[in-house]
C-alpha cells in the first residue's frame, strides 16, 4: 500500500509494458500498492519500498494457464514451482472432466482420475471443502477451479459403461449445483475417456442447463480428436448451444499422421460456430501430448514415452518400443504389463500445432501433469516456449499477441475479474521477462527444468519468484466465479 509519505510498494521503472490487450508495447513505469496496480506512466518522481530497474525487459500481466491438472498441486501451501517459475500466476483446474471434488474414494482412482494423484487426494465430499483447504493454506499462485463431469459420474453411478439414469442425473445436478454455489467457475467433460465415453450428448446438455443458470463456462476434452474430430466439434457446439453456455475446446489437436493438416478444416468449423455462439479453444506448443497409457493412443503415435507406471516405476522416461524389445514381447503386452501407467504421445504435426496456436481465439494451456514421475516438458515450459520458440524464433505472431493469448483472452473467457491486463485498479499479477532470453529449457529427456529469462513474478502484489526461483510468499487466492 502507499505509506504516509506517498510511497508505493513496488515500482518498475522504464519497463517495456505489454499490457495484455494486444496493443503495441510502450516504455513506461508501473507501480503497485497492496494487491493492486496503483499507477502507470512516467513516475520519475515517485518513491517505492522496492524499485526494479526494468530497462529492456518486458512487463506483462501474469500468465493464466487456461488448461491445467494442478488440482492437487495447489494444496498444502504449494510453491507451484513448475508454474510460477515460468511466469504463470493463475491456473484453471478441473479440466477434462476430472476434479478432486466432490468425490471421496476408498480405493485407487480409475483412469483418468489417477492423472490427478492417488486415492488420498479424493477426500472432499463437497467442492466447498476443497476450496476451503486451498484458502486455509494458500499456494503461490491463484486457482480458478472447475468441476468435472467424470468426477460427478464416479460419485453418483454404480456403472460407468452406460448413460446416466434420470435419478443419477439429478444426483449429479445436486453436486454440480453445490459446486457452482461454492464458486466453481465452470464445468468440464472428458468424453474421450472410458469413464465418460458412454455419456450421450443429452446427459451433458441436462447438466449444462444448470451451468447456464449460474453463468458459468463449459470446457471439453472432446469425444474424438482423431478421425472423427469434425463430428466431435459439431457435437460440442450443439451441446453448448442447446445448453446456452460459452464453450472452450480443450487442447485442440488433430491426432495421427492420417489426420495431419485437418486443422484447416477444424478451425474453419470453429470460425463458423463463432458467428453463432461463444466458442474458444486452448492449445500447447508441442507435437506430443500426454495422458494415461492406452492402446488406442499408442496406435496413433510415432513414438511413445512412459511418464509413470504403477507396476514398473523404474521404467519412467523410457521409450515404449524399447521396453517391448527388452522384455521380448509385443507392444500390446508391454502396455498390459505397465498399466496403470501414463505416457507421452508424439502424434501431431508442427504445421497443425502452429496453425492452431496462431488462431486469434486460441488461449495457451499447458495441460501439464504434475503428478507424473517423468512429466511432459509442457508442465515447466509451455509459456516460455511460446514466447521464445514461437514468437522470437519462428515469428508465428507478435509478442503482444502471444501475451494476449496468455492473459486478457483467458481472463475474459473465464470471467476472472480485474486480472489479465495491466491497468490501474487491477490485481498486481505481473511477470517481468527478458524477450531476448526467454526460453523453455525443459526437454522430453529432462523435463523438470526452469525456464530461462523470467526475471520476476508477482502474485497479488507479492514477490512470488525472482530469476525463476520461487520465494516464500504464498499470496495465491481462489478465484471464484464472478456473480
Feature locations, PLM:
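Short, ordered loop/turn segments at secondary-structure junctions
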Residues: 96-97, 192, 222-224, 252, ...
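Divalent-metal coordination cores built from histidine and acidic residues
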Residues: 76-185, 277
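Active-site neighborhood of phospho(di)ester-bond hydrolases with catalytic His/Asp-centered motifs
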Residues: 60-67, 92-95, 217-222, 250, ...
Amino acid at each position: 500500500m502507499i505509506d504516509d509519505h506517498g510511497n508505493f510498494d513496488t515500482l518498475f521503472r522504464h519497463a517495456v509494458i505489454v499490457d495484455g490487450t494486444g496493443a503495441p508495447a510502450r516504455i513506461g513505469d508501473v507501480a503497485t500498492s497492496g494487491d493492486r496496480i496503483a499507477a502507470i506512466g512516467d513516475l520519475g518522481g515517485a518513491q517505492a519500498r522496492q524499485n526494479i530497474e526494468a530497462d529492456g525487459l518486458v512487463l506483462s500481466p501474469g500468465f493464466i494457464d487456461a488448461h491445467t491438472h494442478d488440482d492437487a498441486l495447489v494444496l498444502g501451501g504449494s510453491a507451484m514451482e513448475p508454474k510460477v517459475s515460468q511466469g504463470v500466476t493463475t491456473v484453471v483446474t478441473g479440466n477434462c472432466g476430472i476434479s478432486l471434488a466432490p468425490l471421496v474414494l476408498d480405493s485407487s482412482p480409475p483412469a483418468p482420475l489417477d492423472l490427478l494423484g492417488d486415492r488420498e487426494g479424493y477426500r472432499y465430499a463437497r467442492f466447498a471443502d476443497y476450496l476451503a483447504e486451498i484458502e486455509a493454506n494458500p499456494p503461490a499462485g491463484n486457482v480458478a477451479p472447475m468441476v468435472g463431469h467424470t468426477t460427478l459420474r464416479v460419485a453418483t453411478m454404480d456403472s460407468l459403461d452406460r448413460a446416466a439414469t434420470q435419478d443419477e442425473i439429478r444426483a449429479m445436478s445436486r453436486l454440480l449445483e453445490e459446486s457452482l454455489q461454492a464458486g466453481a467457475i465452470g464445468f468440464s467433460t472428458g468424453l474421450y475417456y472410458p469413464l465418460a465415453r458412454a455419456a450421450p450428448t443429452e446427459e451433458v446438455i441436462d447438466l449444462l442447463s444448470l451451468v447456464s443458470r449460474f453463468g458459468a463456462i463449459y470446457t471439453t476434452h472432446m469425444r474424438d480428436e482423431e478421425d472423427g474430430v469434425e463430428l466431435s466439434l459439431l457435437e460440442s457446439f450443439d451441446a453448448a448451444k442447446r445448453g446456452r453456455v460459452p464453450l472452450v475446446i480443450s487442447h485442440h489437436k488433430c491426432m495421427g499422421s492420417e489426420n495431419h493438416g485437418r486443422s484447416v478444416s477444424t478451425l474453419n468449423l470453429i470460425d463458423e460456430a463463432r458467428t453463432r455462439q461463444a466458442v474458444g479453444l486452448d492449445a500447447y506448443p508441442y507435437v506430443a501430448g500426454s495422458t494415461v497409457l492406452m492402446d488406442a493412443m499408442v496406435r496413433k503415435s510415432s513414438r511413445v514415452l512412459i511418464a509413470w507406471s504403477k507396476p514398473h516405476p523404474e521404467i519412467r522416461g523410457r521409450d515404449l518400443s524399447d521396453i517391448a524389445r527388452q522384455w521380448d514381447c509385443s507392444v500390446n503386452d508391454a502396455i498390459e504389463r505397465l498399466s496403470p501407467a501414463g505416457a507421452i504421445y508424439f502424434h501431431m504435426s508442427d504445421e497443425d500445432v502452429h496453425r492452431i496456436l496462431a488462431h486469434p481465439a486460441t488461449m495457451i494451456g499447458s495441460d501439464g501433469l504434475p503428478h507424473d514421475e517423468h512429466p511432459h516438458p509442457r508442465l515447466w515450459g509451455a509459456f516460455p516456449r511460446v514466447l521464445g520458440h514461437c514468437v522470437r524464433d519462428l515469428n508465428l505472431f507478435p509478442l503482444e499477441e502471444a501475451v494476449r493469448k496468455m492473459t486478457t483472452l483467458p481472463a475474459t473467457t473465464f470471467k476472472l475479474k480485474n486480472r489479465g491486463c495491466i491497468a490501474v485498479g487491477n490485481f498486481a499479477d505481473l511477470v517481468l521477462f527478458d524477450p531476448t532470453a526467454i526460453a523453455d529449457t525443459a526437454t522430453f529427456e529432462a523435463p523438470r527444468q526452469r525456464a530461462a529469462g523470467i526475471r520476476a513474478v508477482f502474485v497479488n502484489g507479492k514477490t512470488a519468484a525472482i530469476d525463476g526461483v520461487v520465494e516464500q510468499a504464498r499470496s495465491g487466492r481462489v478465484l471464484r466465479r464472478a456473480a
